[in-house]
Every structure is written in structure tokens, then in C-alpha cells.
């Protein structure tokens, strides 16, 4: 058993800020923790929107605070995001995420990430060992 403090992790390399300034994410659980998934607290800054397509990972996202929407780039279907809503990318869905108000999200990735991943040109994380 172990415990981690979000505020303490935010002071370490577990906190990652996107190169484009759209988001930041503190990775509380990573592949090295041997849980079979990774767990992150991610902030999407107000007014930001961007395309992602996790071709190598499945993701579920729970909204803690803020407001936005996620749109399927395949179907155009939109889901409103607000506190208490979970959205699930269960088919490696290409999607656009929009933050109308700053979003604070709890994210779970399977397979787990190592913490060194950055989005590639298609908005995906590569599998890193």
C-alpha cells in the first residue's frame, strides 16, 4: 500500500505542462506503479480546444470542475462536460476537447503511461517502455 499527495506531486516531474500551453497534468499513478492503469489529474485551460486520438490507449475522464464539451470527430456527436460527468473513449475515438471554463479532470489510461509521453502529430501517445 502507498499514498501520494497531489500537491506534492505537482512539485515533481510527475507534473507535465503541454508545449502548446493547452493543459497540464499531474500523473499520480504511472506504469512503474504496477497497477495496470495510470491515473492523472489534468487541467484544461479555459478557452482551449484541441484534437486528440489515443490510438494506443483507452481513456476514461471524470469532470471534477469546469465546463466544456467533447466531440467525436467521426460522428460529430457532442457530449457536455460538467462536474459529475464521465466520458469514455472506449474505441480509440478521435475527438476534440473544448474547455468553456477551466476543466479539472480525473483521467485513467489503459495501458498505463510511463509519464514521459507527449502527444504526437495525430494527438496520440506512443507506447513507451
From Swiss-Prot:
InterPro entries in the cross-refs: Ectoine_synth (IPR010462), RmlC-like_jellyroll (IPR014710), RmlC_Cupin_sf (IPR011051)
Pathway: Amine and polyamine biosynthesis; ectoine biosynthesis; L-ectoine from L-aspartate 4-semialdehyde: step 3/3
Keywords recorded for this protein, A-Z: Lyase
Domain of life according to the entry: Bacteria
Any single biological process term in GO: ectoine biosynthetic process
GO-annotated molecular function: ectoine synthase activity
Enzymatic class: lyase
UniProt xrefs under Gene3D superfamilies: Jelly Rolls
EC number: 4.2.1.108
Reaction(s) catalysed by this chain's protein: (2S)-4-acetamido-2-aminobutanoate = L-ectoine + H2O
PANTHER family (UniProt xref): L-ECTOINE SYNTHASE, PTHR39289
Family designation: Belongs to the ectoine synthase family.
Described function: Catalyzes the circularization of gamma-N-acetyl-alpha,gamma-diaminobutyric acid (ADABA) to ectoine (1,4,5,6-tetrahydro-2-methyl-4-pyrimidine carboxylic acid), which is an excellent osmoprotectant.
Name of the protein described by the UniProt record: L-ectoine synthase
Lineage: Bacteria, Pseudomonadati, Pseudomonadota, Gammaproteobacteria, Oceanospirillales
Gene behind this protein: ectC
Amino acid at each position: 500500500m502507498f499514498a501520494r499527495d497531489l500537491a506534492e506531486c505537482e512539485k515533481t516531474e510527475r507534473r507535465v505542462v503541454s508545449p502548446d500551453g493547452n493543459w497540464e497534468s499531474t500523473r499520480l499513478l504511472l506504469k512503474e506503479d504496477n497497477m495496470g492503469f495510470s491515473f492523472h489529474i489534468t487541467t484544461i485551460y479555459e478557452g482551449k480546444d484541441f484534437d486528440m486520438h489515443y490510438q494506443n490507449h483507452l481513456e476514461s475522464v471524470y469532470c471534477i470542475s469546469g465546463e466544456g464539451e467533447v466531440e467525436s470527430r467521426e460522428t460529430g456527436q457532442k457530449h457536455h462536460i460538467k462536474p459529475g460527468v464521465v466520458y469514455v473513449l472506449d474505441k480509440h475515438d478521435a475527438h476534440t476537447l473544448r474547455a468553456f471554463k477551466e476543466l479539472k479532470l480525473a483521467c485513467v489510461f489503459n495501458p498505463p503511461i510511463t509519464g514521459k509521453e507527449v502527444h504526437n502529430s495525430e494527438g496520440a501517445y506512443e507506447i513507451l517502455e
